[in-house]
C-alpha cells in the first residue's frame, strides 16, 4: 500500500485482497497490460462482458494481458452473493481463468483505494464516479491508467487498444 506521505504513482503502489482474503501486491503485474473491471453476477451486462472477457483473455494472455475483476454490489444490488459463490459462478459458467478479487466498493467514502486512484487518473467525460457494473480501465505495462471504458463497451471492442499496448499487430 502506498504510504500516507507519498501519492501513488501507478497501480503498482497498491495492495488488494484476493478472493480468499490474502493480500496481493499489484506490482506482481509489472510488464503486463491490464483490464481492471468492476463486475456483477446479476446484471444485464453480465453475460456479454464475461463471455467477451474470457475470449479476449484466452486470445492475449500469452502476450501479456491480464484481467483483474473486482466484484461490486453498489449498482442495483446485482452482486449479492458471497465471494465463493461469485467465483464459482464466474469460473464454472464463464470459464474465467483470470483472477477474481475480493468484493469492493468503487464509489463513496468506502471506495477501495485502487478505485480512487483509477478514477482520479481517468475521470474526465465520465466524472469521478463509476456509473455502473463493468466499467473498465486499461493499464499499460508500466502501471499507468491509459483509458477508461463505459459499461456498455465490450472487451472485444477494446481489442485494438489492447493490441497496441501489447505491441502485437
Swiss-Prot record:
For this UniProt record, the keywords arranged alphabetically read as follows: Cytoplasm, Oxidoreductase, Peroxidase
Among the GO biological process terms of this entry, one is: response to oxidative stress
Please list the reactions this protein catalyses.
a hydroperoxy polyunsaturated fatty acid + 2 glutathione = a hydroxy polyunsaturated fatty acid + glutathione disulfide + H2O
Active site residues per record: 43
Where primarily located?
A: cytoplasm
Query: What InterPro entries does the annotation carry?
Result: Glutathione_peroxidase, GPX_AS, GPX_CS, Thioredoxin-like_sf, Thioredoxin_domain
Instruction: Outline the inducing conditions.
Output: By fungal elicitor.
What SUPFAM superfamilies does the annotation carry? Thioredoxin-like
One Pfam family recorded for the sequence = GSHPx
Instruction: Recall the GO molecular function terms of this protein's record.
Output: peroxidase activity; phospholipid-hydroperoxide glutathione peroxidase activity
Tell where it localizes: Cytoplasm
Q: Recorded E.C. number(s)? A: 1.11.1.12
Task: List, alphabetically, the GO terms of the cellular component aspect.
Answer: cytosol
Query: What does the similarity note say?
Result: Belongs to the glutathione peroxidase family.
* Described function: Protects cells and enzymes from oxidative damage, by catalyzing the reduction of hydrogen peroxide, lipid peroxides and organic hydroperoxide, by glutathione.
| Entry protein name | Probable phospholipid hydroperoxide glutathione peroxidase
What organism is this sequence from?
A: Nicotiana tabacum (Common tobacco)
Amino acid at each position: 500500500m502506498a504510504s500516507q506521505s507519498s501519492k501513488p504513482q501507478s497501480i503498482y503502489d497498491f495492495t488488494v485482497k484476493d478472493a480468499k482474503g490474502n493480500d496481493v501486491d499489484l506490482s506482481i503485474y509489472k510488464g503486463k497490460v491490464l483490464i481492471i473491471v468492476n463486475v456483477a453476477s446479476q446484471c444485464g451486462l453480465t453475460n456479454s462482458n464475461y463471455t467477451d472477457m474470457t475470449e479476449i483473455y484466452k486470445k492475449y494472455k500469452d502476450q501479456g494481458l491480464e484481467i483483474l475483476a473486482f466484484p461490486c454490489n453498489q449498482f442495483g444490488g446485482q452482486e449479492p452473493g458471497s465471494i465463493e459463490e461469485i467465483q464459482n459462478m464466474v469460473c464454472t459458467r464463464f470459464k474465467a481463468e483470470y483472477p477474481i478479487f475480493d468484493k469492493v466498493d468503487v464509489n463513496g467514502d468506502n471506495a477501495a483505494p485502487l478505485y480512487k486512484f483509477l478514477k482520479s487518473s481517468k475521470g474526465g467525460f465520465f466524472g469521478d464516479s463509476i456509473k455502473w457494473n463493468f466499467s473498465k480501465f486499461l493499464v499499460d505495462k508500466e502501471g499507468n491508467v491509459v483509458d477508461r471504458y463505459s459499461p456498455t463497451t465490450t472487451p472485444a471492442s477494446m481489442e485494438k487498444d489492447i493490441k497496441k499496448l501489447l505491441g502485437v499487430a
